[in-house]
């Protein structure tokens, strides 16, 4: 059989992989510079990690580092630490974003291997961590890595994972995601189709169902609403499209999320594009 026929047979047998979801995320919703393009790269050699969130470079053992824009979850922290211990020797450089340490004395940074891939990407692709935007830096590559793990349903995104971290904010979402009402009290990722927007002087409510008293709602305060508009986005254009948000889910009659970081809200790629 020719190579061409073999390829056709393989496609028929296994199907064509579905295209991963593409997103536009705040605060810029698409117009971004390359992550770390304005930060000097520092060559490093890492000590073998003893914990996931207190990393040490052998040249400066007095400084603790934490990987930026990701969060470790309890159920997968041991697996993440094992992966980091196995991969630490491949890390060759560091991008330090803030000279001010956090409450635990750690500095936020990106770390990359010799091929230029972020360590955070590798952990996200394996489904061992969650994306948690916090630096204001572009998250496109990190979001794509997390989406890959979601699409493959691996790690913390696996079906039946308890507790779940990915929920449906509206009935129109395809698949078997649990309802957002089950996410109350947890930090979670919620996908939903935006139904309508209620604007008030100091805030806007993004409603993902016909009854705001019971359905999933996202609150956007006036400052964030203005920032979204400044970025060239009109929230009314999002109606009927898939939205992804992440944060702590509260119970306000129905599941409710107060948006605190525009990077925690993403919209289908088609929105706002020519």
Describe the residue ranges of each PLM region.
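N-terminal signal peptide c-region/cleavage motif recognized by signal peptidases
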Residues: 15-17
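Bacterial N-terminal signal peptides
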Residues: 2-13
């Amino acid at each position: 059989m020719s190579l061409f026929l073999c390829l056709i047979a393989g496609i028929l047998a296994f199907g064509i992989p579905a295209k991963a979801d593409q997103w536009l995320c705040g605060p810029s919703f698409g117009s971004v510079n390359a992550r770390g393009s304005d930060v000097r790269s520092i060559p490093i050699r890492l000590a073998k990690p003893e914990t996931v969130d207190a990393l040490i470079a052998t040249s400066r053992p007095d400084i603790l580092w934490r990987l930026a824009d990701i969060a470790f979850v309890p159920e997968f922290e041991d697996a993440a630490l094992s992966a980091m211990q196995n991969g630490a020797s491949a890390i060759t450089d560091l991008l330090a974003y803030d000279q001010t340490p956090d409450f635990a004395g750690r500095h936020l940074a990106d770390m990359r291997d010799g091929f230029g891939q972020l360590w955070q990407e590798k952990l996200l692709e394996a489904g061992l961590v969650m994306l948690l935007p916090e630096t204001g830096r572009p998250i496109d590559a990190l979001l794509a890595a997390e989406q890959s793990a979601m699409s493959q349903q691996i790690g913390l995104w696996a079906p039946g994972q308890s507790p779940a971290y990915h929920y449906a904010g509206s009935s129109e979402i395809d698949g078997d995601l649990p309802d957002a009402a089950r996410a109350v009290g947890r930090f979670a990722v919620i996908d939903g189709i935006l139904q309508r927007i209620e604007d008030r002087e100091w805030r806007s409510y993004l409603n993902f169902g016909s009854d705001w008293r019971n359905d999933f709602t996202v609150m956007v305060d006036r400052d964030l609403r203005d920032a979204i508009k400044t970025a060239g986005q009109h929230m009314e254009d999002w109606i009927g499209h898939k939205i992804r948000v992440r944060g702590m889910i509260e119970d306000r009659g129905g599941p409710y999320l107060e948006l605190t970081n525009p990077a925690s809200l993403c919209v289908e790629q088609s929105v706002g594009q020519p």
